[in-house]
Amino acid sequence: MPAAPDYPSAPDLVAPKRALLSVSDKTGLVDAAKILHAAGVELVSTGGTKAAIAAAGVPVKDVSDLTGFPEMMDGRVKTLHPVVHGGLLGVRDAADHAKAMADHGIGGIDILYVNLYPFEATVAKGGSYAECVENIDIGGPAMIRSAAKNHGYVAVCTDPSDLAEVLEALKAGGTTLALRQQLAARAYARTAAYDAAISAWFAEALGQDFPARKSIAGTLRQTMRYGENPHQKAAFYTFPNPRPGVATATQLQGKELSYNNINDTDAAFELIAEFDPAAGPAVAIIKHANPCGVAVGATQREAYERALACDPTSAFGGIVAVNSRLTREAAEAMVEIFTEVVIAPEADEDAIAVFAAKKNLRLLVTGGLPDALSTGDTFKSVAGGFLVQSRDDARIKASDLKIVTQRQPTEEEVRDMLFAFTVGKHVKSNAIVYARAGQTLGVGAGQMNRKDSARIAALRAADFGLDLKGCACASEAFFPFADGLIQAAEAGATAIIQPGGSMRDPEVIEAADKLGLTMAFTGVRVFRH
């Protein structure tokens, strides 16, 4: 490990004399170049960046004029040179550095503005392997890291907003050490995220589900007043190219989203994505990341009213998600009780107008539904590390069911079982869902044993006058004993859907036959913790 040299303290104020600009995103470039030139800053640039500046009539040198080397190898080598990196890394007030710079004709570079080749965008648009590789920037990250390391003297900018701060600082005579430190921190965060994106792409391209090293990179979207509880700090970061959901949503009205709002809204929207809008309107109401009512209907308003009927008490202060464009009629029903968030792919203008009277209600539109079968990873932090798993993309169809009882289900019972199991996939384990005709009637969530979940779900239905006779009962994991199934049958369920796979399956099947139930095994467990 290199020892830390005894360098002189960095100056608080640096009046820049030279800037190197090399950008792929040229937003605001010419205006910035004009301001720098007017401030007496010499401009050095490369390729297309230089051409854009020169075309505007602003004096600019080519980096080759400094290095004495032309760009070569299709532009792969242009700034990887001691004159460039010496100009970025040289400690101006260290005598030996100053001598080396003088001996080798190296001038200091006080401002570096680089934004990197659009690797992430190339991947997002489905670029070929060769295109993605060619859009891996080498010289840019190298310069950024050099400049950021020497932030005692160099202001490094990786985004137009960074450069805007530097230009503003010039009005006061130069960049301060505090600003340069902030810019350096952002620069290293940018190169870290860039390398993480490259690493993730290579792992996927090579079919490596779990590479030896895995990085998670996100962009700060929002800093929150507090986290899950008031004594916890929190922020919201988004991944590159996120799928439709909270991360892509535009907030049309309401207070700032809280940590719990985002967590619950994500759960609601992931659930509602299970329901194809082409099959009709569907609505989910979520509380503490658990569904308290889910339903389909002939209209969106009907779907909402049926979902609300499952547990109107828990729906108070909940999250509502819809799978289709939000309508005025549905919005009018939603504002009748206190709701924290409504999230939809789109919203009619007259629906938005209905919510305007509820200024605290947060209305989000995402621009689309996520693909419930899309690939990707989910993460969970544990002490000292994090767990990674592929997204739960289980989708059960009628043809997947194995009927294990003597009685075969009716077509209506099959539909009810599939609906209940789809909802159960989004209920915290142990989970029991009673449903009939595209409507949840009772949800039992998060209990330590399955019998209690079945009992609580039935109590919920009774509390709100919902008759469970002839309903379907879904369990997200197998019944380890017959007691949970018996509990469901006593509540009124006649059709049971569960994964199967218990060593006591024969005992459970026997109990179902004695009770005259029909039961289907899915062969797929959908735990949720």
Curated annotation (Swiss-Prot):
Pathway assigned to this chain's UniProt record: Purine metabolism; IMP biosynthesis via de novo pathway; 5-formamido-1-(5-phospho-D-ribosyl)imidazole-4-carboxamide from 5-amino-1-(5-phospho-D-ribosyl)imidazole-4-carboxamide (10-formyl THF route): step 1/1; Purine metabolism; IMP biosynthesis via de novo pathway; IMP from 5-formamido-1-(5-phospho-D-ribosyl)imidazole-4-carboxamide: step 1/1
Name of the protein: Bifunctional purine biosynthesis protein PurH
SMART domains reported for this sequence: AICARFT_IMPCHas, MGS
Family named by the database record: Belongs to the PurH family.
Every MGS-like domain range: 8-158
Pfam assignment, any one: AICARFT_IMPCHas
EC number: 2.1.2.3, 3.5.4.10
InterPro entries, sorted: AICAR_Tfase_dup_dom_sf (IPR024051), Cytidine_deaminase-like (IPR016193), MGS-like_dom (IPR011607), MGS-like_dom_sf (IPR036914), PurH-like (IPR002695)
Gene3D superfamilies for the chain: 3.40.140.20, Methylglyoxal synthase-like domain
Entry keyword Membrane: no
GO molecular function, one term: IMP cyclohydrolase activity
Assigned GO CC terms: cytosol
NCBIfam families (alphabetical): PRK00881.1, purH
